């Protein structure tokens, strides 16, 4: 697990479309890099690639217990990544802790390794970044919305 503070300013103010200005902690699964420019300004806890899902839950629990020491607010936490982040967000729903402000899903790729969850009712609000109209992320956003979850969709037209 890697801990990084964006620009060494903690707590920090973050502006994200559709979300009020907040100070928050971000648990980043291995689909994204803590050096991606969009994570600048977040208190980031990044998990190494290939870590089992139980480690993600343990990391999220640790962050929720130490969020004040990290300079963020306990009610301002989110998870980010792809399919693993979506499953982590659902695990928080199932356990009732910690309460996530949002899940940020960037090009979530569901498949054999990470099948698309069937029961998404009660999931945290989501921002889903997708590449095309036929993207799995777009389908997952529709599934979340149909279950009554607040969803913001962002069409990524750039190359990654």
Regions found by a protein language model. Give the residues of each.
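Domain-scale detector for complete catalytic domains at protein termini or as standalone homologs
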Residues: 1-160
């Amino acid at each position: 697990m890697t801990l990084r503070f964006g620009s060494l300013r903690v707590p920090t103010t973050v502006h994200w479309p559709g979300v009020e200005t907040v100070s928050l902690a971000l648990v980043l699964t291995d689909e994204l890099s803590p050096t991606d420019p969009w994570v600048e300004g977040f208190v980031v806890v990044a998990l190494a690639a290939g870590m089992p899902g139980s480690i993600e839950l343990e990391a999220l629990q640790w962050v929720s217990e130490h969020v004040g020491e990290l300079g963020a607010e306990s009610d301002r936490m989110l998870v980010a990544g792809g399919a693993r982040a979506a499953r982590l967000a659902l695990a928080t729903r199932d356990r009732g802790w910690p309460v996530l402000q949002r899940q940020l899903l960037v090009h979530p790729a569901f498949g054999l390794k990470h099948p698309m969850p069937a029961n998404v009712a009660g999931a945290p609000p989501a921002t889903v970044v997708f590449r095309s109209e036929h993207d799995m992320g777009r389908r997952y956003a529709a599934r979340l919305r149909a279950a009554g979850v607040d969803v913001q969709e962002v069409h990524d037209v750039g190359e990654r």
